[in-house]
């Protein structure tokens, strides 16, 4: 799945989804050659055309 990061508009590939301790989703992305979990509230999903 791909999603757009709202603050920068950059598109990232989502590799995993997990919930934090409060139950909110976080996306695992690769940013600057590092794996980072970021809150899903900062992303807008992109519908892939088939």
Predicted regions and their residues:
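Short acidic DE-rich linear segments
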Residues: 47-50
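Basic/aromatic-rich interaction segments and small domains that mediate binding to polyanionic partners
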Residues: 1-42
């Amino acid at each position: 799945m791909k999603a757009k990061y709202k603050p920068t508009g950059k598109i990232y590939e989502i590799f995993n989804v997990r919930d934090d301790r409060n139950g909110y989703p976080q996306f695992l992305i690769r940013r600057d050659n590092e794996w980072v979990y970021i809150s899903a509230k900062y992303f807008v999903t992109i519908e892939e055309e088939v």
